[in-house]
A protein has these predicted regions:
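Hydrophobic faces of well-ordered beta-strands that scaffold small-molecule active sites
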Residues: 40-45, 67-71, 105-107, 125-127, ...
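N-terminal small/glycine-rich loop or linker at the start of catalytic domains
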Residues: 24-46, 77-80, 205-214
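Catalytic alpha/beta core domains of metabolic enzymes, predominantly
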Residues: 29, 34, 144-247
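Non-catalytic terminal accessory/regulatory regions of metabolic enzymes
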Residues: 1-41
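Catalytic beta/alpha-barrel core
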Residues: 86, 102-111, 123-136, 147-158, ...
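Active-site mouth loops of central-metabolism enzymes
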Residues: 39-56, 80-84, 104-108, 128-129, ...
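Glycine-rich, proline-tolerant flexible connector loops at the mouths of alpha/beta enzymes
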Residues: 70-88, 247-257
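Alpha-helix-loop-beta-strand connector modules within alpha/beta enzyme cores
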Residues: 83-107, 141-147, 198-212, 236, ...
Length: 277
């Protein structure tokens, strides 16, 4: 059972506006409404690997109908020898992509000391699953005047997830979007990367008024599974999707980060069409 005494700022029953109804807080991100009646799609590369790659994908996801552009400039990798991102140069590339496409930017911040820098470029600051309980980081973004995308930790309970949101809200920032991205289970790695926990969507919406979206890319780890996972997530009540995209003709072997899960822009367009029917 979720102990709602551990969080009250993001608890539905503690806020008179949302008590006793199923309304969701609508969060504005540079003109994009998240939490409304329209399914929001955030799409882009796992990592900003080059200017050419990022601009190509940005134009493609814009044409496919995406609302926002995702892309990692700072990458939390399991091994210190893996590609760590282009860092500030990556942020500059994202800024150029925004200028050329008009798409607001979503990118991850990993360090409390970098919140100000990343916030200069990003319209929506992402807290990744590995940092869901990085409490100094949660406090810092809570003090920053930008909406926050809070991913669920790899093994986090709903209570732990909402307590992390409470850390942010306690500092004054209640512009928080929750993102389910798959959890580690006994079968993780056997036929998928993680397990997409669609069961968490309804109890999350009962417990809090914060909008919830789903990442079908990291949760499945396989491009072929992303379309069905996307449609299932929306059917279960998710209010948006966070999807990784690669170039239409890009060789997966050349991709530096999560090469198996990115979908092609042509597939993205089909997903967007299907979830907005």
């Amino acid at each position: 059972m979720v102990d709602k005494k551990l969080y009250h700022l993001v608890n539905r029953e503690d806020q008179s506006e949302y008590r006793g109804n199923s309304r969701t807080k609508v969060i504005q991100v540079s003109g994009v409404e998240i939490g409304g009646t329209r399914s929001v799609v955030i799409a882009g590369p796992c990592a900003v690997e080059s200017r050419e790659q990022t601009l190509e994908i940005a134009r493609a996801v814009k044409q496919a109908g995406a609302d926002m552009l995702r892309g990692g400039a700072y990458k939390p990798r399991t091994s210190p020898y893996e590609f760590q991102g282009l860092r500030e140069k990556g942020l500059e590339i994202l800024a150029e992509a925004k200028e050329k496409t008009g798409l607001p930017i979503v990118t991850e911040v990993m360090d409390p000391r970098l919140v100000g820098l990343v916030g200069q470029y990003a319209d929506l600051l992402q807290i990744g699953s590995r940092n869901m309980q990085n409490f100094p980081l949660l406090v810092e973004v809570g003090r920053y005047n930008k909406p926050i995308l809070l991913k669920r930790g790899l093994c986090a309970t709903l209570e732990e997830w909402l307590c992390s949101a409470e850390y942010i809200a306690k500092e004054g920032n209640t512009e928080i979007i929750l993102c389910e991205r798959g959890v580690r289970t006994a079968t993780s790695g056997e036929y998928d990367r993680y397990t997409l926990d669609l069961n968490v969507i309804r109890p999350t919406k009962v417990s809090t008024f914060l909008p919830i979206i789903v990442d079908p890319s990291h949760s499945t780890g396989t491009a072929a599974m992303v379309p069905d996972a996307s449609r299932a997530a929306i059917s279960c009540g998710a209010q948006g999707l966070l999807i990784e995209v690669i170039g239409e003709h890009t060789d997966r072997k050349t991709i530096k980060c999560d090469e198996t899960q990115g979908i092609r822009p042509s597939i993205l367009k089909k997903i967007i069409t299907s979830v907005r029917v």
